[in-house]
Amino acid sequence: MKKESKGTKYKQRTISVWNEVAPFYHKRWAKNEVGPFGVTKKLLELSKIKKSDTVLDLACGTGLVTKKLIRKVGSKGQIYAIDSSESALKIAKKWTGDAKNLHFIRADAEKVQFETKFDAITCQYALFFFPNEQKVLKNMKKLLKKDGTITLAVHGKYNVPYFDCILESVKKFIPDYLPKYPEMDRFGTKETFADAIKKAGFKKIVVKKFVFKYSPGTFSDYWNNYKKHLSKPLKEKFDSLTKFQKVNLREMIKDKTLEYTKKNGKIVFPWEVLVLTAKN
């Protein structure tokens, strides 16, 4: 029997997690474009997608970018939206409506093929999930028309305390809390982001930085919501901590949030996002 590769196992685990968390992700984040999801408008502006364009929304998730593309390309354009999570696609199909020029497909971004060529490809908050991003990027190149455009968004590496306050603390108690492969922040600077795209053969690469604000409420809101919506693999690791460890962890995280806590007790985090455009 052929042994599964590290990348294959990671992809299977990621699909399983997204099938579990997609409903919460959509309700809490994507649906209302809160915090970093304010970047969707910027991404579409920078993409310069026009009426009648044929566009691929790669790793479309629950359909935030996809839904806005319907108006962007108009009735004469075509939109193809792919994702590997059945749960996310189910939400996207229901939320975006039944436009005749919109096509949802469950597919692997590394391998998906189309008879048509695309004027543009969008990919918001997904590139870092791919264990072999070069396979995905090179497949994008094959799918694009000559001089077609890609527009990608990723979280910044250094100014996203929403994640760091919790994760850096948790890893002190559970060193293997998150998988080391792939590194989720590996495109989090302008240089590393541009280098990865250049390596895949794209040209005219431009990276812009945006900083949004997000409030998870009070510290109790932030902490309790995090615990409530952990995926099954992370919950199992978290639950392995003793009561004493959990108390210490909570205090450690609370200390990290103090610089972002306002007088009314609400936390307001900055959230850095990078948006890249490039030509085929």
Q: Where do the language-model regions lie?
A:
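Short glycine-dipeptide loop
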Residues: 52, 75-76, 144-149
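Conserved Class I S-adenosyl-L-methionine
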Residues: 3, 7-10, 28, 33-37, ...
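Conserved catalytic/acceptor-binding region of the Class I
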Residues: 134-135, 149-217, 263
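A short SAM/SAH-binding and catalytic strip from SAM-dependent methyltransferases
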Residues: 120-133, 156
